[in-house]
């Protein structure tokens, strides 16, 4: 019985090693919803991300900040709405949304530092306004226009974990 358990564990480790070899130096993008930060599982998620990084994969983290943005906008008594799952963002809300996005990114960076990983929060995303679509004015809500590929590659090649706040410039 014990031999069977040991064999299953050894087979599982061999399978993992095959994947590590196959994906070594590949880039993996991980989205972390900000609700995980308050979860008891947050630390283990961070440890798993660090393990992926240590296995030779290049990790990019893209945290969501919906919960934190909602908290801050509510505390400041700011109105907002959604259309087709996209927050309609007024110009007045942008500083608060930036604050929320960087708060979430900073918490993730701090957790990674606690695991001896160096992360960098950056503005590698150029965005543009969505404009008016089907009669809906998305105001300051935008979409990705361009990524600064060379800068991102430099950060990854130097062994850092880039964190992309959910806001573009």
Please identify what each model-predicted range represents:
Residues 1-169:
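Nucleotide/pyrophosphate-binding catalytic subdomain
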């Amino acid at each position: 019985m014990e031999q069977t358990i040991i064999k299953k564990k050894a087979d599982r480790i061999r399978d993992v090693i095959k994947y590590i070899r196959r994906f070594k130096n590949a880039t993996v993008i991980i989205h972390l919803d900000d609700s995980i930060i308050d979860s008891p599982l947050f630390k283990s998620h961070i440890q798993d991300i660090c393990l992926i990084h240590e296995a030779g994969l290049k990790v990019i983290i893209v945290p969501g900040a919906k919960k934190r943005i909602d908290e801050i906008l509510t505390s400041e008594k700011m109105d907002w709405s959604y259309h087709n799952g996209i927050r309609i963002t007024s110009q007045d809300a942008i500083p608060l949304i930036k604050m929320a996005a960087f708060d979430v990114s900073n918490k993730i960076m701090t957790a990674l530092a606690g695991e001896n990983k160096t992360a960098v929060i950056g503005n590698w995303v150029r965005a543009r306004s969505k404009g008016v679509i089907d009669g809906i004015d998305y105001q300051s809500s935008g979409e990705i226009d361009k990524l600064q590929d060379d800068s991102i590659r430099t950060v990854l090649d130097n062994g850092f974990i880039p964190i992309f706040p959910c806001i573009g410039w």
